[in-house]
A protein has these predicted regions:
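Glycine-centered loop/turn positions within well-structured domains
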Residues: 62, 71
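Non-catalytic, conserved peripheral segments adjacent to functional cores
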Residues: 1-54, 69-70, 76, 82-100
Length: 100
């Protein structure tokens, strides 16, 4: 479990995981989530007042934009931190999902 803090228009993530799933939920403020995997692309707004959350599965490219100042995002992971699990280059991510 970890927390991510951000102010309005601040962007985080911009990566995917090979094996790790992440359950994310704002505990203060609002975020906009941009996700892409082999089968779909979408964006979704999450608001802590509405108790909204989302499960990001492995091999899903994700970008998070904070929509309000003082936003806090709580992230639950099913794996311990391992930098080798990260896919940080979008072109590399596209090659990987094309093979699957």
């Amino acid at each position: 479990i970890f927390l991510v803090y951000g102010n309005k228009n601040f962007t985080r993530a911009k990566h995917a995981h090979k094996k790790c799933s992440q359950f994310i939920m704002p505990i203060h403020g609002k975020i906009e989530l941009y996700c892409e995997n082999k089968s779909l692309k979408f964006q979704k707004k999450l608001d802590y007042k509405k108790k909204e959350a989302y499960l990001i599965k492995p091999l899903t490219w994700c970008k998070i934009k904070f929509l309000t100042d003082y936003s806090i995002l709580m992230v639950f992971c099913d794996q311990e931190y391992d930098f080798k699990d990260y896919i940080v280059k979008y072109k590399h991510f596209l090659k990987i999902i094309k093979k699957k």
